C-alpha cells in the first residue's frame, strides 16, 4: 500500500528553549491526518545541493484522539551544522513542505500493566505529550513520565506534564543532569528509573530520544529481567542521507 503523503503549511515557528523550537503545521492537501498518539512522520526536504533528505519527527499534538487532525505540532532541537535543523530553524510561516506517515509503534497498547514508565530525553518526550489525554482516561494504570534534560531551561511542555500529574495515577519526574532545582531529581533518567524499582512482573517501559540513553536504559531493564516486548523503544538516530 502506498504511504500517504501530505502537503503541509508552516503556521508558527517559535523558540521554546535556547535550543528547541516548536513548529505547528496546518494540513493543506489532504486537509486532515489520522495518527496514533506516539507516532512520527517523515519530511522530504530539499537542500542546496539539490539532493532531497528525509528526516523524521515525533507528533507532539495533545488531542483526545488523533482522528482527522487538521494540524501537526513538532518540537525540534538544533543540531550544529544539521541540514534539517538549519532549514526548520529558519523556516518562515507560510512555507510549504511535504511529509509522509504516520509511522511507528511507540503507542499505548490496549492492555496495559500496573505501571508504565515513559522515559524521554530532550525532544524525546514529544510522544508522551501526545499521550497525555490517553493517560487521563486510563486510570487503572500508574504512569510515570521521566523527562531528562541538562538544565531546567532546556525543558518544555512542563505545564502540560504537571497538569496531568495532578491526577493520582500520573506522576511526573523532571530529571536534571547538570543542576539542582527544587521539585526536580538531580541526575540522569536512568537513576530516577532505578529508584522506582522497575519490575517485569508489573511494569513496562517506553524509551524515546537520544540513542545512547535508550540503549543504556534498555540494558538496565534487561538486567532486571525485562523482555524485549516489555520495553518499547524509539531511537532518534541520525540519518545517513
Ligand atoms: C523516529 C524518529 C523521530 C525523531 N523525532 C525527532 C523529534 O521529534 N525532534 C527532534 O528534534 N529530532 C527528532 N529526530 C531526529 C531528526 O530526525 C534528525 O535526525 C535531527 O533533526 C538532525 O537532523 P539534521 O538534518 O539537522 O542533522 P544532520 O544533517 O543529519 O546531522 C548533522 C551532523 O550532526 C550529527 N548529529 C545529528 N543529530 C545529532 C544529535 N541529535 N546530536 C549530536 N549530533 C547529531 C550528525 O552525525 C552529523 O554529523 C527523530 C529521529 C527519528 C529516527
Q: Which residue stretches match the model-derived regions?
A:
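A short, basic/flexible loop-to-alpha-helix module at the beginning of a structural domain
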Residues: 101-112
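Conserved beta-strand elements of the Class I
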Residues: 117-119, 206
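Histidine-anchored nucleotide/phosphate-binding helix
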Residues: 127-136
